């Protein structure tokens, strides 16, 4: 049913739960699993410090993706990871899902990214409304 699954992560505990759920589904159904993390630097923050800010965000993002891949690996699934840096996270996740031709996007609800609160809540809601495929929302325990 779901041959290609994409899970969007933000480094939160709920994000880990989303990876666990996606990995379990992928393992059970023999699906491919991709994990993405998206960040965007708004124009008003593109100043002389933009390069340093982007480097810091990229470093954090790589740690988030490495951790998420480890969560999937512990669930018995090897996942492909990708960092999305262009556009708003919602748009980036949906565009990447379309590019991959995924059947299911999995997101945690009410996650957070550094410097933001409840970011994944807004992203998960927007992905649910705008995605061209099924979306699974995973709540924390």
Predicted segment positions?
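Solvent-exposed polar/charged
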Residues: 24-27, 98-99, 129
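Structural beta-alpha unit
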Residues: 70-105
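Short secondary-structure boundary segments
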Residues: 37, 108-110, 139-140
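Small/aliphatic-rich secondary-structure junction motif
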Residues: 3-48, 71, 75-80
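Short, well-ordered secondary-structure micro-motifs
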Residues: 18, 45-48, 91-94, 117-118
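Short, hinge-like loop/turn segments at secondary-structure boundaries
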Residues: 51-54, 98-100, 123-124
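Glycine-rich, Arg-bearing micro-motifs that act as flexible, cationic patches
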Residues: 104-130
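A short acidic, glycine-rich active-site loop
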Residues: 52-63
């Amino acid at each position: 049913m779901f041959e290609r699954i994409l899970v969007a992560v933000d480094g939160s505990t709920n994000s880990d739960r989303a990876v666990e759920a996606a990995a379990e589904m992928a393992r059970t159904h023999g699906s491919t699993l991709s994990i993405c993390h998206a960040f965007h630097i708004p124009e008003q923050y593109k100043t002389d410090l933009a390069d340093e800010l982007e480097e810091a965000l990229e470093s954090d993002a790589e740690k988030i993706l490495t951790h998420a891949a480890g969560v999937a690996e512990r669930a018995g699934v090897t996942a492909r990871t990708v960092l999305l840096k262009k556009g708003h996270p919602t748009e980036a996740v949906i565009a990447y899902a379309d590019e991959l031709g995924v059947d299911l996007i999995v997101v945690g609800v009410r996650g957070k990214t550094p410097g933001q609160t409840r970011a994944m809540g807004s992203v998960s809601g927007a992905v649910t409304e705008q995605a061209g495929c099924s979306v699974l929302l995973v709540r924390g325990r």
